[in-house]
Amino acid sequence: MRSRIIGVYALLSAGASQAERVSEPFAKVGYWEITTENHSTCVMKSLYPGKVADDAEALIIVYSARQKTAVLSWITQKPKLPALTQSLDFELSFLKGRSLNSLWGSRPFHIEKSPHSYSFTHAFRGPMDGERFLRDLASHDALVLFFGPGMLTSLPLKASDAVTKLRECSSKIVGQDAFDGLQK
């Protein structure tokens, strides 16, 4: 399952036009792995093994400090959903202790199907949404997705230090780009 999720992750981060993906480790914080992709994007990902072999999930967050945008992808093998189209709206919430923060409301998630899994992706456009998402990710205990009244998933985060490293990674790329621009 891990290799299948990593395959979907590679498609998300590299883009269809890339001939070859270059992924370099940046940091490992708890169960979060932070990498640079193609020397231009920073990604943090966490794999969640399921109770049975076909029940694993993953969260992938892509962040650009230059654009102040973030992308969230939830990957699962067997989503409990109606017939899938190209997009579905999920309620995005965060849990802290027993308190559910549902201020994000309904968000459209683009659907990609691979042979062994589904990827549900939402882009937080603009600095306000991107920064707010990272703050909530860092300060809450779990990310929760609902479809209608039913909960799809609740994944533990423990992401405060990982988000700090993700921001550091992205800032270094912006700094390197500025340095490269001065060298030309």
Task: Please describe what each predicted stretch is.
Residues 19-184:
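A generic "folded-domain core" signal
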